[in-house]
Each structure stands twice: as structure tokens, then as C-alpha cells.
């Protein structure tokens, strides 16, 4: 996610390609930051949605592994369900399988959601889901879970089980 004029982008692209496999020119200066804010807004919302769905399925009695199998081969599939599923042991490499340690901290997701809500306010763009999810992550931080991976949002739904 890069914001720069065309000439500058072409000059720095070889260096940036050593830092990541996808180097996307988003527009002028600042456009990369806008893309990051929007991407993380979507990520925060999608993680909360996956957590909500997984929690509902568990409460209704379906095995979380079976539910994840359905979701990840169906229309609900996304990065949050497949790579970083908030239910422990769906993906052994996910932070949920390590006690929500060593991931993208909840406090960082809260910061990014705050940036998105602020930016939306500046251009008078409603982001209803973003505001709701921001409040959920804020509650997690207030409960002392700011350092946990943001997938720990599932604890808002099933604190006694995960």
C-alpha cells in the first residue's frame, strides 16, 4: 500500500518489493494510509463476524471444527475464518491456538478502528459496523486484554469457553 506520485513510486518500487511480495500503488501521498485504514476496518469487522458466527454455532451445539469446515468451503470464507480463526485449534498456527498470544494486538486494532471512525467523520461517511466493532475492541482493552491478539474478540461472546 503505497501513496506517492507515479515517478516516485517507480523509483522506490524495487526497494519496497524486498519488504513485501505485493506492492500496490494506491495513488498520491496519503493513499496508502487510506487503504490501510480501510483494509483494517474490514478486517476488524470480519473478525467480529466470524467470532459471532462461531460462538452462535457452538451455543447451538455444532462442533466448531465442523462449522469452520463448512464456513471455509462456503460463502462465509475469509482470512479471519480460515487463517486466523478465533476458535482455538481450528488452525494450529493461529493466535487462538496459542492463548491469543503473538498476533496483532487488540489495542492496535482499536487504534486502527479509531482512525477509520475519525476519517469517516471527517468526510461524513457513516460506518455503523465499524463504530460497533470499535466499541467491542475498546471493551476488550478495558478488561485488560489489550495485548491479546484481536481474534480474542470471541471472548465477548463466549468468555467461559475460549
How should these model regions be labeled?
Residues 31-161:
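Helical "substrate-binding/catalytic lid" subdomain
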Residues 1-41:
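Rossmann-fold dinucleotide-binding core
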Amino acid at each position: 500500500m503505497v501513496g506517492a506520485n507515479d515517478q516516485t513510486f517507480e523509483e522506490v518500487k524495487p526497494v519496497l518489493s524486498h519488504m513485501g511480495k505485493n506492492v500496490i500503488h494506491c495513488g498520491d501521498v496519503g493513499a496508502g494510509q487510506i487503504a490501510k485504514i480501510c483494509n483494517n476496518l474490514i478486517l476488524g469487522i470480519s473478525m467480529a463476524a466470524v467470532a459471532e458466527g462461531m460462538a452462535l454455532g457452538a451455543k447451538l451445539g455444532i462442533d466448531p471444527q465442523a462449522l469452520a469446515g463448512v464456513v471455509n468451503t462456503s460463502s462465509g470464507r475469509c482470512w479471519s475464518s480460515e487463517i486466523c480463526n478465533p476458535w482455538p485449534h481450528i488452525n494450529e498456527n493461529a493466535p487462538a491456538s496459542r492463548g491469543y498470544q503473538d498476533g496483532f494486538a487488540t489495542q492496535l486494532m482499536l487504534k486502527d478502528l479509531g482512525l477509520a471512525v475519525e476519517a469517516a467523520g471527517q468526510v461524513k461517511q457513516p460506518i455503523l459496523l465499524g463504530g460497533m466493532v470499535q466499541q467491542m475492541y475498546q471493551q476488550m482493552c478495558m478488561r485488560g486484554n489489550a495485548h491479546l491478539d484481536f481474534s480474542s474478540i470471541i471472548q465477548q461472546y463466549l468468555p467461559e469457553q475460549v
